[in-house]
Amino acid sequence: MSTHGPNTLFAPVNILSRAEAQDIAQRALKNSPAEETRVSISSTARADTRFALNQVTTSGENRDTNVTITAFVGNRSASVSTNRLDDASLAAAAKQATEIAKLVPPNPERMPELSQQTYPAARDRVISLPTPAERAAAAKLVTELARANELIATGFIECRASASALANSKGLFAFDSSANVTMTATVRSPDGTGSGWACSDGTTFADIDAKQVAATAVEKAKTSRSPVAIEPGRYVTILEPTAVGNLVQLVVGAMQARAADEGRSFFSKQGGGNKLGMKVVDDRVTLITDPEDAPSTTGGFDGSGLPLEKVTWIENGVVKTLNYDRFWAQKQNVQPTRVGGGFGARSLRMVGGTTSVPDMIKETERGVLVTRFWYIRAVDPRTILYTGLTRDGTFLIENGKVTHPIKNFRFNESPIFFLNNLQAMGPTVRINASENLGAGGAVYMPPIKVRDFTFSSLSDAV
């Protein structure tokens, strides 16, 4: 009988090592009565600090390990999760998953489990969490600068170290680890009319530039007070990197081969087939994901155990890859696309240019500067059309200068449209483009300047 016990939120343990994960997986597989079994393991250590009204309000840490056992009975499957790691609990979860699998409808698209795969060598990663005092010191840089400027700061620091493993009854075992840190700050004016925001994202706490977060958020809060209303319409628009990431990652999310082949997406070709090899955006646009990028947050394998590889989605405006899952790849007689994440956008990189945001502004006769978007919702998948709102600093540009803060807009726009209207790009930087801004949402995006960006209506939201 194993001596492994449950990991609680308060257990003083680190994330699992490869050997520990392999031991758990082997014990879970040994006790499974299913025809085929897959074991997914997630081990996470998390630390966070929240601040509001210019003071730290919460600080916490937790550790947990979760094991999901998927049992396959013919073409039927079911999953059960547990964070109890003893033999009896793992066996009970496997048995329960098997019994449930017998009751669910068969899945005609079910693919057999993979045998052992060859994975790239695991990268050396710094897996550590900052202390509460270190996190509080970073928060203090924001709150003190806000207080000195008679502003109100709110923000969140999240640090996460994690290990993931996948094993199955055909002998496959995969393991990887990662670390992600993000710090965000929103600074408001006391009258509620001004709002500034900034974020710093990295793989270790040393990557976080709290001083820059403080300076940017405070400056935007000061300069965005008392915004004026301008007419909705199509404007030359400069999108800062976070705003670019908010929308450009949706392009890769839409690059599903099956939807394209079945005529349900922008990447469907008129008359049948898909747009592989066709030019769809400006020549300067190249989008890639590469799990071997040094700062990549992507693990080395997908949810079925396939090793991930570098994928060029769009190169010089031309569609190079669509996302084929294993079933659709087999049906179409092609290789599956080896990319992780639900949207295939983790560690997405857009190749940038050389024009800085100040230079873009200098070269703009009349336009709009956008910090970021939120409340982004799909409108039409066939054009990748989305709607959402600007927030935390939207400004009018006139004759090469930022002249006024303006009220927020609702936009109705497709990233495909504005990537065809590209005028300039700046250097690519790491940003967090997740709408919930949790650690692990890193993508690499440049600021861009586009023409005819569609703002459909005004918003009273700050």
Regions found by a protein language model. Give the residues of each.
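Active-site bordering "gate/hinge" segments
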Residues: 1-299, 306-310, 315-318, 401, ...
